[in-house]
From Swiss-Prot:
This is Adenine phosphoribosyltransferase. It comes from Helicobacter pylori (strain ATCC 700392 / 26695). Belongs to the purine/pyrimidine phosphoribosyltransferase family. Its EC number is 2.4.2.7. GO terms for molecular function: adenine binding; adenine phosphoribosyltransferase activity; AMP binding. It is found in: Cytoplasm. Keywords: Cytoplasm, Glycosyltransferase, Purine salvage, Transferase. Pathway: Purine metabolism; AMP biosynthesis via salvage pathway; AMP from adenine: step 1/1. The lineage of its organism: Bacteria, Pseudomonadati, Campylobacterota, Epsilonproteobacteria, Campylobacterales. The gene is apt.
Length: 179
């Protein structure tokens, strides 16, 4: 990806201090979505990255991974599969717990998300990689459905947190922007 696009993306992302709690500098991608030409460039860049890899599905993590993932799935002409917080999917699901700073949470995927096809090739996508807990739990769900995660893709990877390193130990990991 060219440096000009990286700079444009960085400039389009709003930073909100002390959100959702004191001491956090939140990276708000909703401002990027206000620039359709830039958003198109982003999706086109990702499309070029994955077009020749014979991807069957894009798996998006709730909630901003849905935005990036569905646009990328459309661009690639492949299916989109949501990974959601526990209790948000209507049919039979598989669930995976993961640790939070104080406690734990769970995410789910429909048990028939890949239409029962074993060995499908997927890309996991979300807007931001911080500690890696949600992404690692998502990888476990993908594996449980006997799919192969080709790469985990994030718009932003936070270098000062362990997520990038933890994920790279499990799957090829790509962060467009490292902050």
């Amino acid at each position: 990806m060219n440096e000009t696009l990286k700079e444009e993306l960085l400039q389009s992302i709003r930073e909100v201090k002390d959100y959702p709690k004191k001491g956090i500098l939140f990276k708000d991608i909703t401002t990027l979505l206000n620039y359709p030409k830039l958003f198109n460039k982003l999706i086109d860049t990702l499309k070029k990255r994955y077009l020749a890899l014979n991807i069957d599905f894009i798996v998006g993590i709730e909630a901003r991974g849905f935005i990036l993932g569905s646009a990328l799935a459309y661009a690639l002409g492949v299916g989109f599969v949501p990974v959601r917080k526990k209790g948000k999917l209507p049919a039979h699901t598989l669930s995976q717990s993961y640790s939070l700073e104080y406690g734990s949470d769970s995410i789910e995927i429909h048990s028939d998300a890949f239409r029962g096809i074993k060995g499908v090739r997927v890309v996991l996508i979300d807007d931001l990689l911080a500690t890696g807990g949600t992404a690692l739990a998502s990888l476990e769900l993908i594996k449980a459905l006997q799919a192969e995660c080709i790469e985990a893709c994030f718009l932003i990877g936070l270098k000062e947190l362990p997520g990038i390193q933890l994920l790279e130990e499990r799957v090829k990991t790509f962060c467009l922007l490292e902050c």
